[in-house]
Structure formats: structure tokens, C-alpha cells
Regions:
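Juxtacatalytic substrate-recognition/specificity segment
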Residues: 10-27, 33-171, 186-189, 215, ...
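Beta/coil-rich, acidic/histidine-enriched accessory regions frequently appended to metallopeptidases
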Residues: 16, 268-414, 441-442, 498, ...
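Acidic/His/Gly-enriched intrinsically disordered linker/tail segments
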Residues: 35, 110-135, 148, 166-318
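Structural motif corresponding to the intra-repeat A-B loop/turn of tetratricopeptide repeats
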Residues: 341, 375, 409, 423, ...
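Canonical positions in the second alpha-helix
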Residues: 353-354, 387-388, 435-436, 471-472, ...
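Short coil/linker segments at helix-helix boundaries
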Residues: 404-435, 456
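TPR/TPR-like (Sel1-like) alpha-helical repeat modules
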Residues: 421-435, 491, 496-514
Length: 552
């Protein structure tokens, strides 16, 4: 049995309500089951906070975070748009032996080692881990930087916001430059300072690029602007990205703003190159690097300030209730953050410990089910996910993975005509999928699995059933896997007009030649069947796409 040493799987456990079998674990050696950990817990919209710093410092952090959100709403409201399907975990680690190191990723190349913050993100959820105990960050050699946990958090939080807005597609240098620019924002209820280098009184601030790069050579622009970033994303690379973005947006008469915007826009369709750079900035990499060197040494720039008039300052953030974290909350949040960092064994052990101690919170059961599914333990995953679904857990991926497991089960025992699925089997698979469809975030895989399930049905799907799959195509118009599922369903189950339209769309959006050829063959197969009659003066030509593909 993988997981905590000294545990063995036993017979199933029956819980109240519908008969749901759960794995049961027995502790062979009680010394191997760690005691519950003492953490503080707080919740604000979209975030769960797990803290091992003092109560006073935790309250200060939450006030600062809420005030930061208000500041962003005032000066950059677009950054706050977007859904957070699963609350983002904020883990605040305290003094020695209180946990930051245990969250370091298994693959140290994912995030640079030696910092006081970690950021993890998947399509479903994110996590930020902050070290409040570290005094200095070692940059290499004898170079050190004062560790500021608040600035580290601002950087991680803005990274989270930027990736949510750009769907993780921003060039690494662009994301890093914006992250460092935003993280340097200073604010209180009466004053907001943005894009300022230095403290305004002749002294430097932590993270200022001119201090970081004063004695450093400029990294070649081709390396800095690489589409996947440099091989090592050092603090000095981050500082140069910050310098480049700051110079373009706020330096020397704002002369580089328009070229910078053109460059970023064209990168949406073109790979970075010196030719593209010259077309936008009218300078070579080397020429611009020389300018940037001068800007680093003599930073003449425009800052942005907001000062509230008397009686119009930002409101005081409301107090956030805080309490001792429940065992299942510690296990679930820590376990999932460890899993995000690739620490799969530690994640499983952390998740299973509160379960062994008797915790049955639905969110813990869902997390355990997803963990077991990711580890390939489908039988245990199904039991945990069935129990979580029975308790009406609010997590879309739990229902998606449960539907996958149910489909795998019923397809080997098909009871319908022609070896297809009967109505009861279809309902068993589609029920969790339609629950997932109602929950955030929308997932292409949900619609793809709906299409796959209908393709195995003994009963022919109706137009309204195909319409649900088309709904997914509208939401994810460039997802070729979903588009292929929808096309094949329409082609095989008697919807030639929709099959042709979907296949033609697939030809347009597919990037792989093999996918394009497959879509092209399907479209050609239906060409004669759906070829419209020539329009007469009294007739309107047929739409190029059936109504079902049109946006409402």
C-alpha cells in the first residue's frame, strides 16, 4: 500500500445515506501516524489561508491583502476579472522548522531555489507559499538581497492574476517584467505609488532593478526574450525584464510605449526575432541594450501617484474571521499544494493522515479521490469520488474524473443493443458530467467526455444532445481534441450538416497536419450530402454553418 508506512488497506467502510464504500486503513504502528498540525485558518472570497505565523502577523497580512485588492480595483480593475474555480491556497510559513522547505518543488527547475516564495498553478487551482522566516535571499556568490515576505507575496499574487488573464500564454519576459513592476507598488489608504524606482527620497527599495543590475552585464536580448525564457530564470534575469518593461512604459518621455505595444501584439502571432524587434523599435538588440544600460545607471522615469482628497481615502478592510484550522483543512490544503509541487508521496501521506484519524469532509474526500486517480489507483479513487459526489461536493474535476471511472466500468459491461450502452448506463456516466458542466471552471474535457459517451449509446442522440457538445465547441473553439469528438459524434450519429461544419472548422484551427487531413477527409465525405441548392431571387442562401453552431 503506497502512502504512510505502517498503513494497510482493509475491508470497506459504509457511510450513511446511499451505500458508498470507502477504503478503510488500519494503523499498524501508531508511531508512524503523525499528530495533527497546528495551523490558523481564514477564508476570503477566492482564497483559503493556512498560517503558521503569529495571530497578529496573520491579521496584518490579511488586512494588507484586502487593501491591495482594493488598490488593484482602483488602478487596474481588469486584473481582478476572472473565475477562481477552486479557492487559491495561501500558505504562510513561520519560524524555523515550520514548513517552507517541505513545499519546495521536487523538480527545482520549476521555481528558482533560494527564494522566499513559491507559486504553483494548474488549469484547476493555484497555490502561493510565503516564507516569513527568511532574512536574506542569496543571489549567487556574495550577493544577497533582503527578504521581504510582503513583496514576495505581491509578486506571486500578481503572477497569479496575470496568468489568469493571459491564460498562461504571456511570454516569460513580459510576465516577469509586469510582475516585478506591479510588485513594487506602494500603498496605504491615502496614497498609491506605481512605477517608482527608489523611495522618493534618494534611497533604494528592495527589488529595484537599478540596484540589482548596477554591477552586472546586460543579458543578450535574444536570450532574455526567448519564447520559453532562459535556461535559468535568475533574479538578475527578472531584474532585466523589469528594467526593459519599465523603460518601455515609463522611461525617458514615454518614447518606447507605442513600439512596445506593437511588439507585444505581434508576438501573439509571430515568434520573437531581432528582425521583428527592429521593425517595432527601429533598433537592433545591441543598440537597445546600450540604451537600457544607460537607463539602468541613470533612471529618468515617470511615476504614477494617486493621493486621496480629505474624506475620500480607501475604506478600512473589514476584519477577517480566523480560527484554528481543522485537521481535514490542514491535510487537504497542504496535501494539494505538495501535489502541485510534484511531491506525490508527501502529498498522499498528508492527505490520508486526517482520513485515517476519522475525518470525512467532502472536500477532503474529493482531494483524496483526485490524488488516487492521478496515482493510477482507480478503485480507491472511485470510492473516494463516489462518496464526495454523494455529499454534493462543489468541485467540477471530481465529477469529471468520477464520470471517467464510471465510463471505464460500464463500457466493459454494455447492456444495450449492439454492445452499446443502455439508458441506465448512459445516465450513470452523464449525471456527474452534467453536474461538472454547471460548476466552474468550464472544462473542454467535460464536453469531450459527453460526446464520447453519446457515441457509445445504443439510443441515437437527439439534436438537443448534440447541442450540449456544440456548447463546448463554442467555449473552446481551438480545442482540436474536443472538436474531433464533436465532429465524429455528428458524423456517426446522423447529423451531416453539423459534421461538415465542424470538420471545416477543424481544418481552420488545427495546427497539426495530421489533424487537418483527418478533418478535411470528414468534410469531403459530407460535401455532397449537404451541398445547398442554388439560391433563387426569392430565396435566401443557406447559412454556411447550421444554426446550432451560431452564437446566440
Amino acid at each position: 500500500m503506497a502512502g504512510l508506512p505502517g498503513l494497510r488497506a482493509a475491508d470497506s467502510l459504509v457511510v450513511s445515506g446511499p451505500v458508498i464504500e470507502l477504503p478503510k486503513f488500519e494503523v499498524v504502528d501508531s508511531r508512524l501516524l503523525p499528530p495533527p498540525e497546528a495551523w490558523r485558518y481564514a477564508e476570503i472570497p477566492g482564497f483559503e489561508i493556512l498560517s503558521r505565523i503569529s495571530e497578529r502577523e496573520t491579521k496584518r497580512f490579511m488586512r494588507d491583502f484586502l487593501l491591495l485588492q482594493t488598490v488593484i480595483g482602483e488602478i487596474m480593475p481588469m486584473l481582478l476579472r476572472g473565475q477562481t474555480p477552486v479557492p487559491t491556497a495561501l500558505v504562510l510559513c513561520g519560524g524555523r522548522g515550520k514548513g517552507f522547505d517541505e513545499f519546495l518543488p521536487a523538480d527545482r527547475s520549476i521555481e528558482q531555489y533560494g527564494t522566499n516564495s513559491l507559486f504553483f498553478k494548474t488549469a484547476e487551482r493555484s497555490a502561493i507559499v510565503i516564507d516569513f522566516a527568511l532574512d536574506e535571499i542569496q543571489l549567487g556568490g556574495e550577493d544577497r538581497l533582503e527578504a521581504d515576505p510582503y513583496r514576495a507575496f505581491y509578486a506571486a499574487y500578481f503572477r497569479f492574476l496575470i496568468r489568469r488573464q493571459t491564460i498562461d500564454k504571456a511570454p516569460p519576459w513580459f510576465e516577469e517584467g509586469l510582475v516585478q513592476l506591479f510588485a513594487a507598488t506602494e500603498f496605504d489608504k491615502k496614497y498609491i505609488s506605481f512605477a517608482q524606482i527608489g523611495d522618493g527620497f534618494g534611497a533604494s527599495k528592495i527589488g529595484d532593478f537599478n540596484q540589482m543590475l548596477h554591477k552586472r552585464a546586460i543579458m543578450p536580448f535574444g536570450e532574455m526574450l526567448a519564447p520559453d525564457g532562459p535556461s535559468r530564470r535568475t533574479p538578475f534575469w527578472a531584474a532585466q525584464c523589469y528594467a526593459f518593461v519599465h523603460y518601455c512604459l515609463y522611461g525617458w518621455g514615454l518614447k518606447n510605449q507605442a513600439p512596445f505595444v506593437r511588439f507585444v501584439q505581434r508576438l501573439g502571432e509571430e515568434a520573437p526575432s531581432e528582425t521583428l524587434f527592429k521593425e517595432c523599435f527601429k533598433k537592433s538588440y545591441k543598440q537597445f541594450a546600450t540604451e537600457l544600460r544607460g537607463y539602468i545607471d541613470f533612471t529618468a522615469h515617470k511615476k504614477v501617484e494617486f493621493k486621496a482628497k480629505k474624506g475620500h481615502e480607501l475604506p478600512e478592510p473589514p476584519p477577517v474571521p480566523m480560527r484554528a484550522a481543522a485537521d481535514h483543512e490542514v491535510g487537504r490544503i497542504k496535501g494539494e499544494v505538495l501535489r502541485l509541487g510534484g511531491n506525490s508521496t508527501a502529498a498522499h501521506n498528508t492527505l490520508i493522515a486526517p482520513y485515517v484519524r476519522g475525518e470525512r469532509d467532502p472536500r477532503l474526500l474529493a482531494a483524496l479521490g483526485l490524488d488516487e486517480k492521478q496515482s493510477g489507483n482507480d478503485d480507491r479513487a472511485r470510492k473516494f469520488l463516489e462518496a464526495a459526489a454523494s455529499a454534493n461536493v462543489q468541485r467540477a474535476r471530481a465529477y469529471l474524473e468520477l464520470a471517467r471511472l464510471r465510463l471505464d466500468e460500464v463500457r466493459t459491461k454494455a447492456r444495450g443493443a449492439g454492445g452499446q450502452l443502455d439508458a441506465d448506463q448512459m445516465s450513470r456516466v452523464l449525471t456527474p458530467l452534467f453536474t461538472a458542466r454547471k460548476l466552474p471552471p468550464p472544462m473542454a474535457d467535460v464536453y469531450g467526455l459527453i460526446a464520447e459517451t453519446w457515441s457509445l449509446s445504443a439510443a441515437k442522440p437527439e439534436a438537443e444532445h448534440l447541442a450540449v457538445v456544440i456548447e463546448g465547441v463554442r467555449m473552446f473553439p481551438r480545442d482540436t481534441a474536443l472538436l474531433m469528438h464533436a465532429t465524429l459524434l455528428a458524423a456517426k450519429r446522423g447529423f451531416p450538416v453539423e459534421a461538415k461544419a465542424l470538420a471545416e472548422r477543424g481544418v481552420k484551427v488545427s495546427k497539426e497536419a495530421g489533424d487537418q487531413d483527418r478533418f478535411r477527409m470528414i468534410a469531403a465525405a459530407f460535401e455532397r450530402d449537404v451541398d445547398p441548392k442554388p439560391a433563387t431571387p426569392a430565396e435566401k442562401p443557406l447559412e454556411t454553418e447550421p444554426y446550432i453552431l451560431k452564437q446566440p
